[in-house]
């Protein structure tokens, strides 16, 4: 333990021990134990170096770089499903075949709390107000059940790896237990935690303290998924289960097509090692990350990084050249994860976020609740590994926004991306499936179609000719 203390002092963090003599023996041990947990993963000197590098990286990327060549993905890497039902059917068959062989697993990023939604629960527990009152977790679980039903002769259980965070882990597990895992086998679900990183002062040279025995810490961003996969030995679990393909998505999109056979089939057909879904930008100036190439390497660029001229540029078909909006929905070949995971964890850059961080001042012994940003939180971005994948092994599939993307970011009554927009998108999609199946739906009527009944509009022929003349109906299996 004394080695831990020395490690932090040598890294210039003697302020952490300013009140050492006034701490009780128990508090001294607790402080050292907490510091050792942090330093066992990354030395304090390395963390401080990472923060300094992130500050430099931020300064270097704070303006539009005219020396960088930004282009759309080439046709060999980019394909649209819009108006392309023949290809969609082909990919569906390929993906469903892989699911039937037990080769597909799903990773869900579900570490967020529903704070902005006015809820203290994990975001996945949130009820968007459907007639069925189903939560996001239940909707997603039932999509897996439906897929398993479609290959039931194979007796497949799709492994579901759910990444939580320190604040949401216990509540998430309890929620699944209370609901009997929504009909899934408990053994096919694995919970694991996202990592955390210490917070720094604005100079990036000192750690901030939460209280006399703890550093202030925060989640390490969606890019922390890779280190979490490594530290929780998921690759070894993929091997044990015979998994070859991994589908990754975020909890807050009610339209997510979990373990999407079409997307998986797209990657298999073209031999892609990493693939991502995109939705078409609504207009040239929609503030959304764009999937593109930077100096002929795949990447995601922020809207703020490109000039107005480039944002508005159109191709020969009159479409925006840069139109592939990022929805953080990925495919990974397990062989890629085995090969590159270590180097990703070692080499991925950190990004800084200046935040108002409640802190304890060990010199004065006082707590501060700042009204202005007083510190730096570090985070990693999941797409920062894209440029390590050869362009011919990287794919992007454009999907229909109305069918696949309705994020839940903001609370009830807000301008967009709220429970109302999510609920409407979900009900409209199910209702459109019924109409496609030959049902007669009166104007203004919306029907909820359970994910257990239909995954993507199939299995609804029994409603042909049936009249739906009121909203609030839930069609269950």
From Swiss-Prot:
Residues annotated to bind UTP: 109-112, 123, 194, 221, 252, 377
Binding site residues for substrate: 222, 409
SUPFAM superfamilies, per the entry: Nucleotide-diphospho-sugar transferases
EC number: 2.7.7.23
GO biological process: UDP-N-acetylglucosamine biosynthetic process
Main location: cytoplasm
Position of sequence motif Substrate binding: 109-112, 302-303
Reaction catalysis annotation: N-acetyl-alpha-D-glucosamine 1-phosphate + UTP + H(+) = UDP-N-acetyl-alpha-D-glucosamine + diphosphate
GO CC annotations, alphabetized: cytoplasm; nucleus
Modified residues annotated as Phosphoserine in this record: 218, 461
Organism domain of life: Eukaryota
Annotated consequence of substituting residue 115 to A: Decrease of activity
EC category name: transferase
Annotated consequence of substituting residue 112 to A: Loss of activity
GO molecular function: UDP-N-acetylglucosamine diphosphorylase activity
Effect of residue 117 to A: Decrease of activity
Keywords: Cytoplasm, Nucleotidyltransferase, Phosphoprotein, Transferase
Disulfide bonds: none
Biological function: UDP-N-acetylglucosamine pyrophosphorylase that utilizes N-acetylglucosamine-1-phosphate as substrate. Together with AGM1, is involved in the production of UDP-N-acetylglucosamine from N-acetylglucosamine-6-phosphate.
Family: Belongs to the UDPGP type 1 family.
Name used for this protein in its record: UDP-N-acetylglucosamine pyrophosphorylase
Gene: QRI1
């Amino acid at each position: 333990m004394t080695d831990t203390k020395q490690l932090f002092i040598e890294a210039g963090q003697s302020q952490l021990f300013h009140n050492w003599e006034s701490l009780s023996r128990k508090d001294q041990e607790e402080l050292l134990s907490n510091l050792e947990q942090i330093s066992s993963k990354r030395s304090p000197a390395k963390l401080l170096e990472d923060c300094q590098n992130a500050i430099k990286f931020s300064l270097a990327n704070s303006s539009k770089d005219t020396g960088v060549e930004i282009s759309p993905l080439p046709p060999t890497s980019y394909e649209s499903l819009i108006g392309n039902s023949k290809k969609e059917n082909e990919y569906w068959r390929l993906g469903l075949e892989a699911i039937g062989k037990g080769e597909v697993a799903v990773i869900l990023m579900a570490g967020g709390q529903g704070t902005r939604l006015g809820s203290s629960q994990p975001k996945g527990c949130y009820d968007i107000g459907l007639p069925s009152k189903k939560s996001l977790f239940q909707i997603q679980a039932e999509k897996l059940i439906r897929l398993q039903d479609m290959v039931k002769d194979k007796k497949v259980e799709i492994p579901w790896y759910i990444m939580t965070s320190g604040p949401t882990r216990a509540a998430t597990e309890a929620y699944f237990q209370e609901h009997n895992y929504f009909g899934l086998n408990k053994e096919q679900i694995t919970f694991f935690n996202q990592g955390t990183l210490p917070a720094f002062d604005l100079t990036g040279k000192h750690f901030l303290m939460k209280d006399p025995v703890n550093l202030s810490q925060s989640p390490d961003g969606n890019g922390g998924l890779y280190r979490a996969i490594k530290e929780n030995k998921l690759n070894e679990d993929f091997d044990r289960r015979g998994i070859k393909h991994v589908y990754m998505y975020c909890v807050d999109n009610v339209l997510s097509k979990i373990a999407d056979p079409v997307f998986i089939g797209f990657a298999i057909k073209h031999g892609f090692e990493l693939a991502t879904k995109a939705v078409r930008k609504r207009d040239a100036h929609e503030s959304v990350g764009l999937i593109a190439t930077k100096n002929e390497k795949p990447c995601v660029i922020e809207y703020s990084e490109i000039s107005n001229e480039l944002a508005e540029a159109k191709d020969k078909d009159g479409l925006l050249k840069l139109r592939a909006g990022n929805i953080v929905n990925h495919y990974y070949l397990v062989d890629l994860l085995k090969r590159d995971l270590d180097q990703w964890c070692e080499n991925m850059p950190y990004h800084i976020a200046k935040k108002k961080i409640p802190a304890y001042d060990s010199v004065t012994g006082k707590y501060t609740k700042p009204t202005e940003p007083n510190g730096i939180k570090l985070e990693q971005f999941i797409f920062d590994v894209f440029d390590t994948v050869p362009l011919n092994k990287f794919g992007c599939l454009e999907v229909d926004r109305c069918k696949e993307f309705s994020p839940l970011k903001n609370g009830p009554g807000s301008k967009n991306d709220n429970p109302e927009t999510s609920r409407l998108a979900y009900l409209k999609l199910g209702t459109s499936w019924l109409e496609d199946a030959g049902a007669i739906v009166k104007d203004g009527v919306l029907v909820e179609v359970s994910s257990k009944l239909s995954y993507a509009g199939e299995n609804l022929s029994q409603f042909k000719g049936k009249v739906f003349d009121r909203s609030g109906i839930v069609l269950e299996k």
